[in-house]
């Protein structure tokens, strides 16, 4: 049986990480960990609570943004494309971890519960351990792309070729296994070496979750109108 046509969406260089060793003793980290009754090294770095500590880190102004991953995943997993089994989503982090996400996964809407889930994932390597709806592996972005083995790679980039979303959907539809890479950081450029056709969907920079929505919806109609009977 031939493989089903799917979009492979990668949130790359995501600012999702546990607290780095060099700031474990910072008061902002220690106090937050005490309130949560967790060890400092087990908590997820979050600029909302750890802003003072981030000033001591390289790239501190862009780090500690698990909220970006949270919103992107909520939107992607609840999309029609995912419900029709035409989407696979991955998260690649700044420290070269990859989160594999089963399409049936339903993430917590509540942000604090999501943070708790991510902390469990980084500690255990899979959650829940018996089902592995989320699985964490050490892997570079390029290793992930090689593993997916797409027939086309597109990188969403503000310096890319300007293309309206509808036309980008038509372009994606020309391939059976396209991969789209979206930066999971608030500003700046990719840290990882990223190869692919650079595409921009708007004349101004957009947040990652907006790009996720535009990419999915642009591809959604092109694919679903051909394969689904639910909309006829």
From Swiss-Prot:
Organism for this UniProt entry: Pyrococcus abyssi (strain GE5 / Orsay)
Entry's Gene Ontology molecular function annotations: rRNA (pseudouridine) methyltransferase activity; rRNA binding
Binding site for S-adenosyl-L-methionine: 183, 188, 201-206
HAMAP family: NEP1 (MF_00554)
Family: Belongs to the class IV-like SAM-binding methyltransferase superfamily. RNA methyltransferase NEP1 family.
EC numbers on record: 2.1.1.-
Subunit organization: Homodimer.
Pfam name, any one: EMG1
Protein name: Ribosomal RNA small subunit methyltransferase Nep1
Site label Interaction with substrate rRNA, positions: 65, 106, 109, 113
Any Gene Ontology biological process: rRNA base methylation
Sites marked Stabilizes Arg-65: 67
Matches recorded under InterPro entries: Alpha/beta_knot_MTases, Rbsml_bgen_MeTrfase_EMG1/NEP1, Ribosome_NEP1_arc, tRNA_m1G_MTases_N
Function text: Methyltransferase involved in ribosomal biogenesis. Specifically catalyzes the N1-methylation of the pseudouridine corresponding to position 914 in M.jannaschii 16S rRNA.
UniProt entry keywords in alphabetical sequence: Methyltransferase, Ribosome biogenesis, RNA-binding, rRNA processing, rRNA-binding, S-adenosyl-L-methionine, Transferase
Catalytic activity: a pseudouridine in rRNA + S-adenosyl-L-methionine = an N(1)-methylpseudouridine in rRNA + S-adenosyl-L-homocysteine + H(+)
SS bond partners: none
NCBIfam families reported for this sequence: PRK04171.1-5, PRK04171.2-2
